[in-house]
Amino acid sequence: GKATQRTYEDGMPKNESTVQDTISYSSGENIKTYGGPEVRLSARYLFTPDFSVKASLNNSYQFLHTLSNNTTVSPIDTWKISDLNIAPQKGYQASLGFYKNFKENEYELSIEGYYKKMEDVLDFKTGANLFLNENVETQILQGDGKAYGVEFLLKKKSGDLNGWLSYTYSRSLYRFDSEFSEE
């Protein structure tokens, strides 16, 4: 449908006083094009019939964002597509896992670690107002992040008693740097 898009002064925070222009787009007109290859590589090496190592690498892009304001109770999420002011989120992930079967495959033990680097992650400014806000880019910050962790899993796959026991340690860190005190 029809849309309008604001442009803001370079090197300034996005707010009412830094609006340079408002561009109108007709239905079906392209506002901004983003793209990129999403590569996925994986490998498995079987050292013995009951021991293997698996590794994977991938990258991804997120062009559509869910904006959920967690500071107030509301069942409404706002959806925002990447545009002139909000870049798509990018992620790069690597993982490495070791898998071992015991007692003729009755038990399986696995240990897997991962690391993920993220760019242009969205977060809200303090006191952000998203409800019926046509210019949500004024309420959003974009930054970088990383996540890493390790997962342990022990499975008992057969017999009268079966199930699994697992433990995951993970950590996510984000940085939203701005040279402007209002952000």
Language-model regions, residue ranges each:
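Gram-negative outer-membrane beta-barrel transporters
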Residues: 114-117, 136-183
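Membrane-embedded beta-barrel scaffold of Gram-negative outer-membrane proteins
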Residues: 46, 52-58, 64, 68, ...
